[in-house]
Amino acid sequence: MILITGGAGFVGSNIAIYLKKLISQSNITVLDNLKRRGSELNLIRLKKNKINFIHGDIRNTEDLKFKKNKISTIIECSAEPSVLAGTSDELAYLFNTNLTGTINCLNLAKQHNSNFIFLSSNRVYPYTEINKIKFFESENRFILKENQKISGFSLNGIDESFSLNGLKSFYGATKLSSELIIQEYSKSYKIKSIINRCGVIAGPWQMGK
């Protein structure tokens, strides 16, 4: 079984449907708390593609008990995705979902010896460093300037040596913290893991806030 947390969201649902079409005989199961507005609209699409849905929350370990099915891979798409999260009274939800929830998913991966794929964010990079990147504005786009002496940055983008030190928002901090914990779990418990630092993602069935 492939478990996709946050699987009724924009990214999670599209991944689930893509995987089901790619490997039609596979058991694709999504888990989502349906908190984000519009996510319930994806349930029709998931059902149409014969994808199993579980109404659950990664903050609650009781919702992460899978005794009947062996989980081969967990794709962790669940998150409070707003960069503005934490500027209101949602700070506890942000931490409990983006950090504690990920730890709960890692413990599930440990129990099932599952592969673990984590959707992180380019928001792990500090905006103080990002703001040092020089560019100019053309008629229809921003164009990066050449010969910039910023460690980890080139016209090809940002690599692993780019600095992670500095302020990055509460959201970015939870994602970076999760990355570090994933690496520790991978080392200590031999969990095969992939961390994908996604940029701005847009497309069909994006519901917004």
Locate predicted features.
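N-terminal Rossmann-like NAD(P)+-binding domain of SDR-like oxidoreductases, especially those catalyzing
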Residues: M1-G199
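Substrate-binding strand-loop-helix patch
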Residues: A202-K209
